[in-house]
Amino acid sequence: MSERPDLNELRGKLDEIDNSILDLLEERMAACRQIGNYKREHGMDVYDPSREEEKFKALEEIAGFESRPYVRELFKTLMDISKDHQNKPAFGVLGRTLAHTYSPEIHSLFDSSYSYSVIEREPEELEALFKSGVFKGFNVTIPYKKNACAMCDELDDASKTTGSVNTVLFEDGKVKGWNTDYFGFIYMLTRKGISVKDKKVLVLGTGGAASAVFYALKTLGAAETYACDLETDINYSNVYDRAGDAQVIVNCTPVGMFPKVDNSLLDLTRFPVLEACADVVYNPSRTKFLQEAEALGLKTCGGLAMLVAQAYKSSRIFAGDTAGAGLLGNPDSENGAAYVPAEAAELIEKVIKVLENRMRNITIIGMPGSGKSLLARNIAAVTGRTLVDLDIAFAEKFGRTPAEVISESGEDEFREMECEIAAEFLPKSGLVVSCGGGVVTRDVNKFYVRCNSNVFYLERPLTALTDKNRPISQLHGVEKLYEQRKDKYETWCDYKVSYDRFEEKNDFYNRAIADILGKLK
C-alpha cells in the first residue's frame, strides 16, 4: 500500500501549479495586448460576444470532470480581465532592435492605467506608425530620437534645444514631443549628492545622450562644459591638457557597456581636482569607469537611475498629468530643477531597487569550505535564477578541476585561469554565483566580482570550515589563508552575513537564504 502524501507535499504541488498558471497568465495577457493593438489598427471592436460563447462551449467540452463545472465562470472572469487589458490606452517604446529593453517592466511598475508594448520599426515604417492611430504615444530610443523630433508639431524646450525627442504623445490632433532624458540625468546626480553648479564638467561623447546631458548641465548652472570625443577639438589625446581641471566627468559613450565591460576611456588620476564621475551606462551597474572613480574616493552614479527617472516623467505624460510632469526638471519652478516631490522620489527609488536587484547577480564570496556552493544552489532553487559555480564552470571550460590544475601546474597558473572564468561569467545579469575562496587573491577580479553583483561575504567560524579536497587550505592552513584574505572579503562585499555553527545544516541554509534575500527587498 503506497503512502499517502502529507499536507506539506500537497501544498508544495499546488504552489508549483500556481506558479505555472502565473507564467501562462503573463503570456496570455501579453497576447491580449497584441490582439488589442491589432484590432485598433484594423478598426475592429474589442468585444466579440459570439466568439466568446463559442470559446466557452469548446472549453467545457475538453475540460476534465474536476474543472468542468467551473470553466465558464473562470474563463468569463479571465475574458473580462482580457477585455479590460485590451481597452487600456496603448503606449510603448519605439526603436529598431529592442530585445533587452527594460521599459515595459519599468512602466508597469509606475502606472497600470495604460498598456505598454515594444514597437520595433525600420526607418521607412516610421511615418506610417505616426499616422496609424494605434498608439496614444510612445517613448523613443536609439536610433529614432531625432526622427521623432522632426515629426512633432509641438516640442518642449529640452527637445527644441537638443533636437532630440524621447517621449511622444498624440493629443488634440497634434504630435507633441518631450525630452525627459535630461530630467533623468538631473535625478541621477541629485540622488548621489553630486552638484555641478559653478563647476567645470567634462562630457565624454557627442551623441543623443550627451545632448540631453549638456542641457541638464546648463539647467543646473554648470560654470563650464567640455565635449570630448574622437573628432572634437578636445579629444582623447589632448584631454588632459585641455580639460585637466574638470571637477566632474560624465561618460555618455557606450564604452564599458556589457558585454565589452573591460574598457574605460580615461586615466582619472590625471585630473587633480576631480570630485565626481557619472556614467549613463546601466549594464553593468558598476562600470570600470565608476569603479576606478570609487577607488580614488570620488562620488559616483550609474545610469540605471537616469533610465528609471526619465521613464517616470514619461509615465506622468502618458497618464495625462502633463502639468505634474512639467514640474520635474523645471529650472523656473519655485523649488528648482532638481526638486522631486517626496512621493515621486519614493516611487522612483522603489523601481530602481527592483530593477537593480533583478539585474545584478547574487554573488557569494568567502573562505573555502564555508558552504558557498550549497548556499548558492539553494538560493538558485528558491529564486529560479541560473546557478553558476565558478569551480564547476572552471572544470567544464578547461577539462580539469581546480585541484588538478593546482597539483599539476601550480597555483599561479590556476589563478590566471580562474581570472578567465571570472571575466566570462560575473559581468552577466540575474545569476547566482558561487566564487572560489581565492578569487580575491587577484586584484583584477575585484572589478568582475563587483561590476554587476550584489556581493555577499559568507563568514563562518574557522572551526566550521572543511579542507577536504581543498589543496590550498591543506598547504597553507585555514588560519593563515583567513588572515591573508579577510580584508579583501570585507572590502569587496556589499553585505556580510556571519553565522556560527548550527546543529542542522538545513537550519544554516534556511537562515542564510532568508537573510540574503531579505537584504535585497
State where each predicted segment sits.
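NAD(P)-binding Rossmann-fold cofactor-contacting core
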Residues: 220-236, 391-393, 397
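Domain-level signature for soluble enzymes in the chorismate/prephenate branch of the shikimate pathway
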Residues: 1-90, 476
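Phosphate/diphosphate ligand-binding glycine-rich loop within oxidoreductases
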Residues: 91-192, 284, 290, 296, ...
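NTP-dependent small-molecule kinase module
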Residues: 345-358, 378, 382, 470-471, ...
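ATP-dependent small-molecule kinase phosphotransfer cores
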Residues: 392-440, 445-447
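A glycine- and Lys/Arg-enriched "phosphate-lid" helix/loop adjacent to the NTP-binding pocket
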Residues: 451-488, 492
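Rossmann-like adenosine-cofactor binding region
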Residues: 235-301, 439-445
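Adenosine-phosphate binding glycine-rich loop
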Residues: 280-358
